[in-house]
């Protein structure tokens, strides 16, 4: 939080600002918190909980610093991950299941301005990080056309029957579930391509598997 708080001090309180900060303290394999804060045993679940506690503490420090600014009530904070991970399965860097469900992972949106949420209702449809761009534009009262695939979660409804698209680089899977089209690649595919190898879409010789991957790309373009 020290670096984020330093950047916060440099921002004007009289004009709009955007601060994007990426932390790796809770990133797998959960070795990125200080040893002075907690031990780092072989048990990945213990490290995971330590990493989450450390991240939570640092977020608290950041919010305390933010709350002292005169523009605090005009500020909206989004907290999200840089990508998904199959938390309910064995990950490539943590050789043990973490015992978590993906349904326990949320994107947090915080604001001290209670009027911001007046009149809003709970929505049960699918939302994702693709929707954050349009939503932030709405909160900032930017009414210009934009290139985002997503929808403004505060004012727009997703067209009925239109599937959402979810891609994961981890553990390739693809299919329809609750009107959501999901797909991804094996880790080996991703790393091989990143190292200059073949494209992930040409690696498989199994016709059915290749066809499903093509459908995923086609669905993404359609949305």
Each language-model region and where it sits:
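Solvent-exposed soluble domains appended to multi-pass membrane proteins
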Residues: 1-223
């Amino acid at each position: 939080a020290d670096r984020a708080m330093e950047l916060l001090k440099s921002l004007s309180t009289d004009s709009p600002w955007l601060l994007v900060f990426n932390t790796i303290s809770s990133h797998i394999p959960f070795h990125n918190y200080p040893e002075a804060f907690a031990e780092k045993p072989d048990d990945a679940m213990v490290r995971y909980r330590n990493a989450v506690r450390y991240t939570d503490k640092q977020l608290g420090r950041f919010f305390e610093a933010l709350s002292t600014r005169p523009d605090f009530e005009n500020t909206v904070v989004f907290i999200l991950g840089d990508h998904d991970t199959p938390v309910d399965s064995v990950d490539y860097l943590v050789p043990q299941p973490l015992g978590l469900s993906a349904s326990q992972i949320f994107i947090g949106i915080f604001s001290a301005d209670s009027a911001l949420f007046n009149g809003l209702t709970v929505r049960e449809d699918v939302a994702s990080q693709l929707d954050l761009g349009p939503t932030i534009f709405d909160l900032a009262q930017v009414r210009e056309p934009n290139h985002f695939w997503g929808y403004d979660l505060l004012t727009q409804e997703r067209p009925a029957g239109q599937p959402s698209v979810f891609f994961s680089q981890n553990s390739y899977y693809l299919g329809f579930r609750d009107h959501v089209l999901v797909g991804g690649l094996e880790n080996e595919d991703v790393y091989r391509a990143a190292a200059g190898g073949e494209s992930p879409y040409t690696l498989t010789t199994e016709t059915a598997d290749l066809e499903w991957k093509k459908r995923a790309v086609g669905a993404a373009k359609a949305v």
